[in-house]
């Protein structure tokens, strides 16, 4: 039995996002990142609903960049199980639901849940010194901005593939340094290479060194830019209440 959901708009945000865990838990990653979107896409098509599917910058290899951010026309080439299963999810959505928005985002953080910003703040408090890779570059994205742009996009009925990230490009080291500065935590952040990090953490999955995204289609469709990642991060800290989430 299926309810009539014509003009409903389910948003598939669920994912197995533990990049390292995906390398050893293939079935779990496939179920969450590929089969889940497929099942929802089939249900949406059957009931006449539209569908938003949130995907990732990790569908790209990041091996050949030339310093240019990747737009929606760039051909994916994932180098991890996480990226591969997320790309499969995209393909299923394209195949089974013709009224879809696939929205790739990157380096997402929020007031709630586990994310890089909270990890760096907590690690800085605990250890006082951090090593963060400086040769992997992308776009930090505030979840508030992602939600806002998805809402703006959905009223257009311009279905297809979109990139939605914070404006500006930085390395994980740059991101971590700004997090520590804005948080006021007394900690030092030192840069390291991906190879140096891998030597200390051999179980870690490969990650793209250049996964910067260009929001070209979003700009042309919605008509506005996402906030610069530094401005969005500063706003996050201005309204963050630690374990309580967002300030009232």
State what each model feature region is.
Residues 149, 156-203, 237, 244-246:
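Mid/C-terminal beta-alpha module of Rossmann-like enzyme folds, strongest
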Residues 132-137, 162-169, 221:
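Glycine-rich Rossmann NAD(P)(H)-binding loop
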Residues 10-13, 53, 163:
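Rossmann-fold scaffold of SDR-type NAD(P)-dependent oxidoreductases
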Residues 24, 31, 35-39, 46, ...:
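Catalytic helix-loop patch of NAD(P)-dependent Rossmann-fold dehydrogenases
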Residues 4, 8-32:
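NAD(P)H-binding glycine-rich loop region in Rossmannoid oxidoreductase-like domains
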Residues 91-138, 143-145, 151:
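NAD(P)-dependent short-chain dehydrogenase/reductase
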Residues 206-248:
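C-terminal amphipathic/interface module of NAD(P)-dependent oxidoreductases
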Residues 24, 32, 80, 138-141, ...:
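Residue-level signal for the nucleotide or nucleotide-sugar donor/cofactor binding architecture
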């Amino acid at each position: 039995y299926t309810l009539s959901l014509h003009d409903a708009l389910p948003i598939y945000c669920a994912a197995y996002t533990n990049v390292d865990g995906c390398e050893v838990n293939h079935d779990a990653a496939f179920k969450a990142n590929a089969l889940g979107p497929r099942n929802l896409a089939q249900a949406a098509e059957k009931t006449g609903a539209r569908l938003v599917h949130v995907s990732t910058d990790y569908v790209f290899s990041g091996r050949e960049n030339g310093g240019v951010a990747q737009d929606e026309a760039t051909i994916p080439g994932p180098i991890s199980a996480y990226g591969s299963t997320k790309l499969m999810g995209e393909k299923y959505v394209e195949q089974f639901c013709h009224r879809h928005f696939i929205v790739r985002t990157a380096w997402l953080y929020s007031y709630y849940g586990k994310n890089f910003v909270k990890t760096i703040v907590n690690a800085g408090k605990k250890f006082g010194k951090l090593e963060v890779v400086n040769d992997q570059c992308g776009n930090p994205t505030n979840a508030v901005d992602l939600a806002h742009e998805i809402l703006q996009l959905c009223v257009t009925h311009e279905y297809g593939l979109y990139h939605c990230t914070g404006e500006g490009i930085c390395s994980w080291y740059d991101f971590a340094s700004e997090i520590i500065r804005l948080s006021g935590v007394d900690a030092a952040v030192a840069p390291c290479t991906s190879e140096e990090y891998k030597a200390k953490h051999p179980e870690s999955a490969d990650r793209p060194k250049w996964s910067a995204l260009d929001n070209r289609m979003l700009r042309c469709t919605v008509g506005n830019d996402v906030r610069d990642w530094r401005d969005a991060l500063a706003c996050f800290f201005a309204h963050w209440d630690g374990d309580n989430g967002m300030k009232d």
